[in-house]
A protein has these predicted regions:
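Non-catalytic, C-terminal membrane-associated alpha-helical segments of glycosyltransferases
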Residues: 233, 237-240, 252-309
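A conserved acidic beta->alpha catalytic loop
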Residues: 35, 46-54
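Short beta-strand/loop segment that forms part of the nucleotide-sugar
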Residues: 40-49, 67-69
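Short, well-formed alpha-helical segments that are part of the catalytic scaffolds
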Residues: 19-38
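Conserved donor nucleotide-binding strand/loop of the catalytic core
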Residues: 57-77, 83-85
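Acidic/His-rich active-site region of diverse nucleotide-sugar glycosyltransferases
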Residues: 73, 77, 81, 98-188, ...
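Catalytic donor-sugar/metal-binding loop of nucleotide-sugar-dependent glycosyltransferases
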Residues: 179-180, 184-187, 193-215
């Protein structure tokens, strides 16, 4: 006679860490940290060698431990590093420009009592005009409820990972390069979409908790004095990541057919802004074309923003 006992670790303040990946985020991260309960451990992965940033954070906040990566790892790799450093079963990933409401964590803990089978759980944006999730086709009216409901995808700026559940789900994958939580081939954009799709494809569940609300400043993670450089980087990586995501999950042909019109339009706009000598727009559309070209020939996501002051 074999008796199987299933143990489920519950979410509590002691069993939940906050993870924030940063780069040039000094101007916004303090709002984020101050919105988090002081008794909760916070892991900050700073994608640079900025020791002053680390010292200032750890001096000001006793619940913060900052790790320097010494180079810009990007979001996926930075999150993987932070998750590996965490000692809790649950990790809430936040962008530094996210602000929790007073009861956000409490509502997440309460929701756990009714949905223990989740791999990923997400709070919801307080502004209902900008949903941070995509619904399943059969669940289109779930937004009407206050109860947690299943979705097929959540945005990466606020997502709670059930580490043990994810490890079990992702162990079904055979590709050696996918043993991390996030696929590190993504430097920026769609690493969260990729993780969500892998979870769903392998039988996992993703939920949104409507009572757990957050505010997102949106595109404010990096100091605004680097706005142009951030914009150049975003345009390169969005096109590269979109092609890579589609190729990975749907094949090269779909990725090419969907991406080529953007590539052609980017070339046209690049030439136009070259003629009228608009350097910023010229660079944006050059980067879009470059991102597509590099993705099609199989080059890695190599572009890095230049933040030299």
């Amino acid at each position: 006679l074999t008796v199987c006992i299933h143990y489920t670790m519950s979410i509590s303040r002691q069993n939940l860490s906050i993870l924030i990946v940063t780069l040039k985020s000094e101007n916004v991260i303090h709002q984020c940290i101050k919105s988090i309960n002081k008794d909760m451990p916070i892991i900050v992965v700073e994608n640079s060698s900025n020791s002053k940033f680390k010292e200032d954070l750890e001096k000001k906040y006793t619940n913060v431990k900052c790790t320097l990566s010494f180079k810009n790892l990007g979001m996926g790799s930075g999150n993987n590093l932070g998750i590996k450093l965490s000692s809790t079963d649950y990790v809430l990933i936040l962008n530094p420009d996210v602000i929790l409401e007073t009861n956000t964590i409490d509502e997440i803990i309460l929701a756990f009592k009714t949905i223990q089978d989740f791999a990923i759980l997400a709070p919801i944006l307080a502004d209902k005009n900008y949903p941070n999730y995509q619904l399943d086709q059969n669940n289109e009216f779930s937004i009407q409820t206050e109860k947690a409901f299943k979705v097929k995808n959540v945005d990466g700026f606020a997502m709670l990972l059930n580490k043990k559940k994810l490890e079990n789900i992702l162990s079904k994958e055979t590709s050696n390069d996918e043993q991390n939580y996030f696929d590190e081939n993504f430097f920026m954009y769609l690493e969260n979409d990729d993780l969500c799709k892998r979870v769903i494809n392998n039988g996992g569940n993703i939920y949104v908790v409507p009572k757990a609300k957050i505010n997102h400043l949106a595109a404010k993670s990096v100091d605004q004095k680097f706005a142009d450089e951030v914009e150049f980087s975003r345009n390169w990586h969005w096109i590269w990541s979109k092609f890579y995501f589609n190729k990975k999950h749907f094949g090269f042909l779909k990725a090419f057919v969907e991406g080529f019109p953007r590539f052609f339009l980017s070339i046209f706009k690049y030439l136009f802004f070259l003629l009228i000598n608009n350097k910023t727009k010229k660079k944006i559309y050059f980067n879009r074309a470059s991102g597509f070209y590099n993705a099609t020939i199989g080059k890695p996501s190599w572009y890095r923003p230049n933040f030299n002051e």
